[in-house]
Amino acid sequence: MKKDILTEINVYHTVLSPQRGYNIDNKKIKAEAVKGYVLSAKRMEEKDCWEYKDYKFISPCTELSFLDTAIKDEFFAATKKSIKLKDRWVNIYEHLEQSYSRNSLYLNSYAESPWYTCIYCCDVVKDSSELIIEYDNVTKINKLNKYKIENNKLFIFPSTLRYFFSENFSEDPNIFITHTYNLNI
């Protein structure tokens, strides 16, 4: 009997650590991320939009390019596919705050939508929140998969998947950097 795989959804995750050859100074990245938050440099000014809580980088630091290279290297090692950065933004969730359920698609133009979403846990309190990814499988609709967060942890998944961050139970804010990528074809 032959088998044809029609769909396969993968979520790639790892921790970028010095033992893996990555020495990313996330304090510098955090400083730039917080700057956009403090100056209220929002990606979208409409309060009814889920992008209202997304903040721009005011002046991206060199560490962000190191992070981007690490993400590309990790993805290539896992998939043998090359990706290029499309967009990047910051999300900061205070005590008892959670995010909206969203995906990274451009609903008015699927052709312009990114292929992959990458979440980087820049400065988080371990186990204070979870990344929750929603997906459909053959037998269930809106199935949830929960992932623990920790500093320097990286998640890469298709941009069609909806995701959100659960409530932050820590007294400290959790800082996430979201990247979107296209395939280099």
Model-derived features: positions:
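Solvent-exposed residues in well-ordered beta-strands and their adjoining turns
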Residues: 17, 93, 121-123, 180-184
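Exposed regions on extracellular, virion, or secretory-pathway luminal proteins
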Residues: 80-81, 147, 168, 172-173
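Catalytic core of non-heme Fe(II) oxygenases with the double-stranded beta-helix
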Residues: 87-156, 160-161, 166
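A short hydrophobic beta-strand segment most commonly corresponding to one strand
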Residues: 117-119, 154, 171-185
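Hydrophobic beta-strand residues in large extracellular and virion-surface proteins
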Residues: 29, 71, 75, 90, ...
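Non-heme Fe(II)/2-oxoglutarate
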Residues: 1-82
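Aromatic-acidic/polar surface patches that form glycan- and anion
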Residues: 60, 64, 111, 148, ...
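Residues at beta-strand starts and edge strands
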Residues: 8-10, 84-86, 114-116, 173-175
